[in-house]
């Protein structure tokens, strides 16, 4: 286990029924690049997303939303809408709205146009109240309150594990939440200097390709839904709780989801509305949010105000860090950004205080490493300022404070691939450009990243082998675009000696064995060990059948290329399967607990090259080199795609995306993708993902 070239060996006791881990170099199928299995379905339009759901007699649902940031609801008159043909209405009787776009009334009609007519027929009378929509204004004493009572923290599968924190609340500020390590006062006393900076980051909306949506139908007393979700089973569980049903009475399907970065856990309000409308109407109902309401109500990455104070020695060693953050997730919680400062580098002493600030804006939620981009920006900016103050190479400063053996190797690999040694040349070229009157300057920089290894307990996989040789793999996990079918098939193909394309991977159905939600980078690490266990158990049982066909001992049977062999005798896969007793051979695999292995925090480093027009402020990213430790990749193409996607979202966040709020009205002015700009293909730089060879030594995969 450990970094290639620096590995350690250790004896372990395997969990009961769990296969032994792969040995180094014994993976003929996994750990490689290959085309994704669902690609043809997607590019030909055969993949069915929730937006595509259609059924005879189906109704189309819409939500009447508040045009105000803060108001009392005086009355809701649905009488005209109720008289329209085929219209059903769900009126929860809301008394107060706290953000522009908050749901007030849901309805469904035979066509989308009819639903829009019904929306216009609903008359809501508001008593508009004062609002506060900026982080700075909401923090002030005497600011308009968003909530009169204390708010409890709510967590989803996209958040870091841990209990919700009970924190003090004064005005609109909830917190601070204190945390840290070491003796901060001692660290500052030992410092030869201090540096303090403040950074701010803006809101980033999820802007999933497929907006949030749900299709619901009641079949007797069973609720069947198709959902655009990151959690097949979390949707099932929430709907079962709302409607007081046993879990087997809620069936959730999620074979294809058009993107999810933390906002698609659970049924959400639109999903509950959809199911209630379907129950009232006795007909299937589709709710597909429009882009505007999706941007307003479905969640976002909170903004942040971060203060970083570093104590340092003149050789660049950081002796202590004092960190304070405020952020607004609108009417929600969870804006903390201190995870990075506490864990990314080897600062010996850290004191952190994180506070949520409520505003009259749509709720924030988990989004791709919650809190880390904001915290990373703050800490890395402070390190850059410190390097400048000390006249020190920024990379050398980071190496001075980075005790991670893995990331030190990544810094070295990345610097070489990127050409970090060009710094002096670039400085001279910029001086020449300035002398010639050119506004263009070239710059390079580097920064670290960090995430954690989380495992969802209870994941189970079923492998079913039919007598005609068909092999099916079943798990209820959803695919949010990462292509999870492909690594599942690769693992089973490796154990069974079959072509990857020959396997049928069936996912996204809550009637299948339990699978993890897709959040916090938990999916593959939770699922693949269970896949391998199921595949090994199925192979062992099939070897028993093959031994009888070949007239050999089970210990002599080998399988490769779809052929069983033993002492000169051969039988192809289908011939052996035809001798399976009964109709099918079924084997299951469970995700066993991790054994004690290497440090499996996920370390990474990025190097970037940009061109800046110093007159206009336009920044063009030319190249990014990203070096990452992802353990042992099952499917390299998929891992590299995830790295590329994260880089593109990061560039988009930094340079393109900006939610614009009118402070006078409290309304979001650009809830769209025309004026809320996201990075496009013409803005995409050269991206070089590099995976370091690391052996976690914690499970069978």
Regions found by a protein language model. Name each.
Residues 1-627, 684-686:
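Structural alpha/beta core scaffold segments of enzyme domains
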Residues 65, 92-94, 620, 629, ...:
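Generic N-terminal targeting/processing segments that precede catalytic cores or assembly contacts
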Residues 261, 265, 375, 484, ...:
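Conserved phosphate/anionic-ligand binding catalytic regions in large, soluble enzymes, centered on
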Residues 501-507, 677-700:
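Generic long, charged, amphipathic alpha-helical segments
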Residues 631-635:
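Cytochrome P450 core scaffold surrounding the K-helix E-X-X-R motif
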Residues 637, 641-675:
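Active-site "cap" helix and flanking loop/linker of ATP-utilizing ligase/carboxylase catalytic domains
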